[in-house]
Amino acid sequence: MKNRKTRRRILVAAAAAAVAAGVILLPGQLMRKPLPLEGVTVLLTGDSRSSDDYTFYRETLEKKAGCRAVTAGASGKTAAYNASDEYMSFILNQQHDFSIWLVGGNDDGSPGTVGTFDAGSVLAAQGEAVVNETDLSADYNGTTFIQAIDHIMRKYLGENERLRNLNGGKTPVMIFCTDLPQQRNSADSAWSRPENWERKRLAIQECCEKNGVSCLDLYSLCGFNMADEPMFTEPTDMIHDRGIYYMDGLHPNSRGIDVITDYEIQKMLEENSPK
């Protein structure tokens, strides 16, 4: 009798541990609880924040969602490079179900560099020039942030047939994030000014609306308080974590990525649900 009670206690404890680990015990079988995006491939694009420099982005997303995540960011590059034929060709030849774009970490968003397509926009009222679309048949040669973002979206969406062929007939979903706040060198630098962060945010939202692209407003949703974060300085330190949600005032740390991926997973589930 004593051995039977002991065995029961062990089984109960094992069952509790299994549930805590995301495992469901059913009569006669052991079944792991499915994660929300199993079998899905997610392409993480943009700059160093989505590159192999910070593998915990990919690892966190895979652990939480059950997906396969591929880091495809170009370290140190601007939105203009992301719009280039070189980078877009690389992206458009990757099999994926979702592409998540976090672009603009190396664009400061200062006045006169962002642009707008709408003469009635907030950006135009702030003095940003009204610009034209770029020519998709040529390599990217725009001069403003908004032209680069728009070029990326139109180029990607225009290659749906190629992407479907890579993806077994399914059209991948493009999710474009508004850029995160950052601070570099000093509070007075262009990188550190909230009005410049907001200018980039407005440009990305304008392009998403213009092109029918799903927008994830990480800038607003995450609500990171930069007053609590360190100031980024060169050279990049990829080892020491000096902040709350940022390693260095530019690159999110594991806690920041935990917040970011929560919103990304939620957005992918929304886009993946039956319409």
Task: Annotate each PLM feature.
Residues 1-55, 62-68, 94, 271-275:
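N-terminal secretory targeting modules
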Residues 157-173:
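A short helix->loop->beta-strand "cap" motif at the edges of active sites that frequently abuts
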Residues 146-160, 201:
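Generic structural signal for well-ordered alpha-helices
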Residues 100-106, 178-180, 220:
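Short loop/turn segments at strand-loop or loop-helix junctions that form parts
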Residues 38-45, 49-147:
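Conserved SGNH/GDSL esterase-like catalytic core that processes O-acyl groups on lipids
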Residues 180-275:
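Catalytic His-Asp segment of secreted/periplasmic serine-dependent ester chemistry enzymes
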Residues 110-143, 168-171, 180-199, 223-225:
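Serine-dependent acyl-ester chemistry module
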